[in-house]
Amino acid sequence: MSVDAFIAYLQLEKKYSPHTIKAYNKDITAFTSFCQDHHQLNGIWNVNYPLIRNWIVYLVEKKVSNRSINRKIASLKAYYRFLLKIGDIDTDPLANHKALKVEKKIQVPFSENEMWNVLNAIEYSKDFTGARDKLIIELLYTTGIRRAELLNLKVVDINFSTKTLKVLGKRNKERLLPIIEHLENTLQSYLNLRNSIKKVAAEEYLLLTNSGDKIYETLVYRVINKYLSMVSPKVKKSPHMLRHTFATHLLNKGADLNAVKELLGHSSLASTQVYTHSSIAKLKEVHATAHPRNKE
């Protein structure tokens, strides 16, 4: 069966982002190619688990990480659940599959000092590009929004009267985020220069390229890497790391976990609890001041 119906289902019913749908499609296409090349199968709707296990072994031999393999399997699981739902298959070949073990890495966020430096010590150019670049970093750090949410922000989402920013999150769920004074100033500076762009092709979108088009993913990564490399030796620099830093800094300052969950747009508290593992410095500080052995 063609995956077209599945892709439409992800778009229309599940409301997945284009980025997520692209990843699902890529994983299913790769598995389809494996079945054709190694097992002479023209479709993947009637495969069994031993064949899928062969694919997993093939990926392991190709040095694909367990984390990546689990993601690929998750794409297939979603596809087979869909086929089961619409009655195209009778059994799910991945129903009893257990995810491969993945070593949990504690990601260390950027420090408060690094974030202060990138937003205050660095001198951004006074033109449109400098204002936009600073706004990208300021938005990601002070609101904790996702990369896709950043790309899709619109001018009308900003309400200076209520000092709130409307964000359209996963599955089209809206949430309002506070606009703090620093962010408000950066927004105003950017908007003043934004109006000077000769050609505004994507007028409704907040963040634009120098030619007036909607910004794209690679540009965001380039901006983050450029400026954070000036203040931090960390290798990994990404929109998600700034989101991670946002959550960790809030929790370090005693923010309520449920409040952070709402700010991040998480549907479950379990997703937010991941960030509590990063508050090592705060835990050490509490331990040092509270434990009797540290007072002897």
PLM segments and residue spans:
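Conserved catalytic core of the tyrosine transesterase superfamily
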Residues: 1-296
